[in-house]
Structures are given as structure tokens and as C-alpha cells.
């Protein structure tokens, strides 16, 4: 895509045994890895790098306000300090990430920052399934944020960016 954007060139959908994933948790790692392998073979691609996503139910997110202009290391310290207030687990039990969203609504030299935390085993299970399928995870996202990012990519390709159109993003889920 011109302008350095992304596009979906191929995709695959594979059925999982009923017991493979329960309540968003991988219960049968080998069954999930095998489904990933089958799908990957159908894609006929040489890349081994993938982006993964966690269900929103497995992630705690919170928007916080921090002073604007912090260096990366200062920002990390502040985020960890704030995260202790909102995450009901010890920080060594979670994977923690953050994204500066932009200036806070107060506009008083503050930034709005989104923090996201998930239990390490939730992240590690998904990474293990990808690795068991011979792939390397480069990105871990939240399903709803990944869907929004995909939607924005599609919207940007619509005539007039979809202005004056009704556009829906539907997540039908699975059971």
C-alpha cells in the first residue's frame, strides 16, 4: 500500500476442537498449535513473524494522566508506579505495556497514557502456541484494539474514507 500502510494479503480460518480454548484460555496447547500450523500451510507464505492478541477479558486497561515530556525511562517508572494502584496482581506476575495517547483533556502539560496488563501465563500460552507452530510472535495486542486498528486500515482505503457512510465492525465471537 502506498504511504507505508498495511494490507491483508492472505488469511486462513481453522476449526479448533471444542476443548482447545475455554473461556479465552488455551486448554489444549498442541491442538491450538496444530490448527495454527494447518492455517499457516494454507497461507503459503515464507514469513514466520506473527502478531497475536489477547481477549479483552484477559487484559486490564486503564487510562492515566502523567506529566507531559517525560523521557522513556521516566515514563516507565511512572507507569509502573501507577499500575500498582490498578492491577490486582504483583507486577512480576504480569506483562505490562503502555501507550501515550496524546495530550490530556486538561491541557495542562499532561499526557493521557493507556496502560495494559495481563497475567504472564496468558501471554506465554499464546506465544507458546505460536512457537510450537514454528512461528515467532513480534506483537501482542488486545483483540478489540487489533480489530479497531484493522478497521482504521480498511476505512482509510474507502472512497472519501467512508465519510457520510454507515460502517460497522462486528465481532461475532465463537463458541
Predicted regions and their residues:
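Solvent-exposed loop and beta-edge segments used for protein-protein assembly and interaction
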Residues: 44-46, 107, 173
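Glycine-rich, flexible loop segments associated with nucleotide phosphate handling
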Residues: 30, 111-114, 162-167
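Generic structural signal for well-ordered secondary structure
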Residues: 7, 14, 29-33, 45, ...
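Helical "lid/coupling" subdomains associated with nucleotide-phosphate turnover
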Residues: 23-33, 37
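Gly/Thr-rich phosphate-binding beta-strand-loop-beta motif of the actin/hexokinase/Hsp70
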Residues: 1-15, 48-53, 157-175
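Phosphate/pyrophosphate-binding loops at sites that engage ATP/ADP/AMP, CoA/4′-phosphopantetheine
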Residues: 36-49, 133
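Active-site neighborhood for divalent-cation/phosphate handling
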Residues: 49, 53-159
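Short glycine-rich, Thr/Ser-proximal phosphate-binding strand/loop in the N-terminal lobe
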Residues: 1-26, 64-69
